[in-house]
Amino acid sequence: SFNYKTFFKLAAKSNDDVKKAFFVIDQDKSGFIEEDELKLFLQNFSAGARALTAGETKTFLAAGDSDGDGMIGVDEFQALVKA
């Protein structure tokens, strides 16, 4: 199963890298990562990667959505990655 904490530990984590990753995942350029974008998270980094399961997506969203609006903003994403 997918573990976002392990993924981020393996990835470079400078502030610039984190922001670049955020904007890659934010496919519709809304300034937020929504649930449908989060589901396809791994595919942004590897073309043949699987989609996250509904449970993995919900867990990831809950971990990153500190204000409870159902989306992950750039500041929330940075806090999640740096955790």
Curated annotation (Swiss-Prot):
Q: Where is the EF-hand domain?
A: 13-48, 52-83
What is the annotated role of this protein in its UniProt record? In muscle, parvalbumin is thought to be involved in relaxation after contraction. It binds two calcium ions.
Annotated residues that bind Ca(2+) 2 are located at 65, 67, 69, 71, 76
One Pfam family recorded for the sequence? EF-hand_7
The record's PROSITE patterns line, in alphabetical order, gives: EF_HAND_1, EF_HAND_2
- What is the name of the protein in this document? Parvalbumin beta 3
Checking InterPro entries in the record gives: EF-hand-dom_pair (IPR011992), EF_Hand_1_Ca_BS (IPR018247), EF_hand_dom (IPR002048), Parvalbumin (IPR008080)
Q: What is the organism of origin for this protein?
A: Macruronus novaezelandiae (Blue grenadier)
Molecular function (GO) terms for this protein are: calcium ion binding
Any coiled-coil regions, as ranges: none
Remaining remarks: Is regarded as an important allergen.
Q: Which residues bind Ca(2+) 1?
A: 26, 28, 30, 32, 34, 37
